[in-house]
Structures are given as structure tokens and as C-alpha cells.
Amino acid sequence: MEQLTFDQLLEAGCHFGHLTRKWHPNMAPYIFMEKNGIHIIDLNKTLAKLEEANQAGYNLGRAGKKILFVGTKKQAKEIIGNAAKSVNMPYITERWPGGLLTNFVTIRKSIKKMQQIDKMMNDPTFSNISKRERLQLARQRAKLEKTFGSIVNMVRLPSAIFVVDIVKEHIAVAEARKLNIPVFAIVDTNANPQIIDYPIPANDDAAKSIQTILESFVESVKKGYNDRIGAMEEAEKEDEEFSEEKLKEKKIKVMEASVDAEEEGKGNKQRRTRKKE
């Protein structure tokens, strides 16, 4: 997997942390220095932790697992959405629906409600109900779409979540931890990296920093998924070749059996002829 370089992280502004007075003590191992009242993140540490996260992301993609991407802050929304879509993963960019993970069964009911409304709207008899009812259903559908539209295909709990800004998305992190779902996250100097399984110390406020980290992670997931597809196709090809070989062996055995039967028949005929003589 191709890894980012120190200079790429530097150019993206991944090293800029928060004001020193807002720091979290557990981020101390990842802080390089203080400059003008701001903590500067050690990008060598960022590279090392990103490599760990990318390897784990590759493994999830290779296993065909689902990762839920979470980022509701303004500068992260579009980046999160595009990244998740590129690997066909669910994502949350609006307000986190409380209980999305810990009360997933109830959340699925809301998603099914949205699907039922879609079915009603596509039914020819939909035009027969009153205009007021149609308007109410349309509004209800729009509200559900805003909250659940990006996770409509998430039929079971994700195998992991990726979070941008764990302070803002603390509820998502808490739910994942409660269910022992691994958490990947971009962790800034104001947050606690010890509650995250795969913390990536970096600036979680600048759009370019978020995009740089996220694109690297997603590429690793994508590579894992593509390797999975390649391995499956190779296995299928081997099965076909094995089946063809087996078929050839079977044909040879049938032919040999036919020859043996024919020779045995000739032998029996010769014996009967001798008896008549």
C-alpha cells in the first residue's frame, strides 16, 4: 500500500493542533512542540499511526466488512460522504441518531418506514389519497431521508467506525465502545486518544487535513476490497479448471469402461462360438 509522506502531511496542515490551554494530557506523546500558543503535532507519529490504521482498514476491506464513516462538522460533511461512497460504505454527516448502534433494531424500523413510504409513492393508487396526506408523507419521507438516507443499506451493525472529531462525535464513540466495535479516528490535541482503537493524531478542523488522511485510509480499504475480489475470481477460476480436469478424467474412465465392456463382449462371443463348434 502506498503511504503518505511527511511533506504531504505538512502541506495539508495536519500538524496544527489546538490552543495549548485546550489540550488533553493523553495527547502528550504525539505533540512535537508549542508555537505561538498552539500545539504542533509530531507528523512522524502521525505517519506511524496512519500506517497502523491503513493496515487494519485494508484487512477489513479484504474481509468484505462494513465501516461506518461519521463526521457532522461543516468542513467534514462532504469529504466524509464522498469518501464513504467511493467504497460503498454507510456514513453519517447529519446529526448522529442516538442509539444508531446501541438500539439498531429500532433504527432499522425507521429505515423500513421510509422504504414503505417509497413503496406507497410508487403505487398507482397513491394519487387516490388526499393532497394533504400526500404532503404529510412527503415531508415525513424527507425527514427520514435526511437522517437515515446514507445508511439505508446498512442491514447490520458495522464492523468498525471511522470518526472525524471525537469530541463532537462523542456519542458515536461511546456507542461503539459499548458494543466493542473498533473505532478509527482523526484525533486532535484537545481529545483523548486512549479511548480510540486506531487514533490518527492530526488536525481535525482543516478540510485539507481531513481529506488527506481520509483519502489515504479509504484507498487502503479499497485495495483490500479489490484484492478480495481478485482472490475470489482466482478461486473461481481454479474451481472451473479443477471441474474441467475432473470432467476429462470422468470421460476417460467412461471410455475405458466402454472399451473394457466391448472387449469383454467380444471374448464372450468367441467363447459361445467355440461351444457351438
Regions found by a protein language model. Name each.
Residues 1-236:
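Ribosome large-subunit tunnel/peptidyl-transferase-proximal elements
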Residues 1-3, 223-277:
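Intrinsically disordered, compositionally biased charged tails
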